[in-house]
């Protein structure tokens, strides 16, 4: 999609050190993977979300057809009845009362979206949704690898599901990567993973990620004070 529609964003990401990983390189050793002619079209872009959003913003700012409004808050939707059916959304209302008319409103605020309440205020039904609790917390810490000491011959992409615990390692831009532990919410002993020292001791027990932290292969991205980021209330939504 980026290559076809936003090549300037892809160029910025490449300059920032984003890595492109072909689908064949992600297959675990020993797993049969018959190649297909279109495999080269499936590419993972390894970069941090902040880097991606920076590149996307830079592209938006440079386009005359797009107006970027910063420091404003959307407080609700504007709408009207047409033909006696459901209300039609006609724009958004800002916190200061300003109304911005629109032919199409796209809400990308994620799981904390106020769209259901805003639609209800217009007399419209909320979007249909199915949500299932995942039953896990995410504990994530970011690192910067030292090329001379990092494990060689691997993409740095790790995904391990051990049943009682899940581990994932994601390569990023500029020699960065993150390690995430998915821990069950009903296991109080694992809540200590929010402490960086306990988090590191925990990682050392797993061969899939331990080499990336052993013998100075990497350092926490902001030094010893790099926090372990915790994400809860995780749901799968459809």
Where are the language model's segments positioned?
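N-terminal FAD cofactor-binding segment of flavoenzymes
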Residues: 1-28
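Conserved beta-strand termini and adjacent loop/short-helix elements that scaffold enzyme active sites
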Residues: 16, 71, 214-215
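Conserved N-terminal helical subregion
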Residues: 19-105, 109-118
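A structural signal for short hydrophobic beta-strand segments in well-ordered beta-sheet cores
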Residues: 76-79, 143, 169
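Short acidic-glycine loop/turn motifs at beta-strand connectors
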Residues: 81, 147, 172-175
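Central beta-strand plus flanking loop segment that forms part of the substrate or channel wall
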Residues: 112, 120-153
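Active-site substrate-recognition segment that forms the wall
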Residues: 119, 157-188
